[in-house]
Amino acid sequence: GIPCGESCVYIPCTVTALAGCKCKSKVCYN
């Protein structure tokens, strides 16, 4: 996928999750 520019190490994807991004390997991917 495409990195969304948001990490999800301590907290889940927030803003990018609204764009359909999901957490993978501590980074939010689309």
Curated annotation (Swiss-Prot):
PTM note: This is a cyclic peptide.
Segment forming the signal sequence: none
Tissues in which the protein is found: Expressed in leaves, petals and petioles but not in roots and runners (at protein level).
Matches recorded under InterPro entries: Cyclotide, Cyclotide_bracelet_CS, Cyclotide_sf
Disulfide bonds listed in the record: C4-C21, C8-C23, C13-C28
Cross-link (Cyclopeptide (Gly-Asn)): G1-N30
Tagged with keyword Disulfide bond: yes
One Pfam family it belongs to: Cyclotide
UniProt function note: Probably participates in a plant defense mechanism.
Notes on the domains: The presence of a 'disulfide through disulfide knot' structurally defines this protein as a knottin.
Name of the protein in its database record: Cycloviolacin-O18
